[in-house]
Design a protein with these regions (language model features):
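Acidic/histidine-rich alpha-helical segments that form the ligand environment
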Residues: 40-79
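Short, contiguous alpha-helical
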Residues: 1-45, 81-133
Length: 133
């Protein structure tokens, strides 16, 4: 589950902060990108051993950032071309997409990984139940 949440840290940094907001700040080191992405070049540390609480603290801050932005965004802003920084960082294929499309990627990833976490928690719960028997 920690790895799934670490991937969402990366999704937030790449698709929300870089594509929706147009920020050029480095990725959060704890994030996990796709396997083909050059981790060190992007400031990522896939070997980091993090607790669930550490990752949840970052995810809470990220969720607050999205909630604050959503409370103020207008339909016109969602329709604009995303201000993706003009550099070679991830995701290169976001250029030319609307802000709404980039936000959609964030929300799709959140929903899909929610399902993965639920699946993993159910599996752990079943394992605990079988060990108690």
């Amino acid at each position: 589950m920690v790895e799934t949440l670490r991937h969402l840290v990366f999704v937030h940094d790449s698709w929300f902060r870089r594509c929706v907001l147009g920020l050029t700040e480095p990725f959060t080191a704890m994030g996990l990108g796709p396997r083909f992405l050059m981790d060190q070049e992007n400031g990522l540390d896939p070997s980091a051993r993090l607790s669930l609480d550490e990752v949840l603290a970052v995810r809470d801050r990220q969720a607050s950032e999205v909630e604050t932005w959503l409370a103020e965004v207008t339909p016109d802003q969602l329709a604009r071309i995303a201000p993706v920084p003009d550099d070679d960082r991830w995701p290169p294929y976001a250029k030319g997409r609307a802000v709404r499309q980039c936000l959609g990627t964030v929300l799709d990833e959140e929903w899909a990984h929610h399902g993965f976490c639920k699946r993993d928690l159910d599996k752990l719960s079943r394992q605990d139940s079988s060990q108690d028997s």
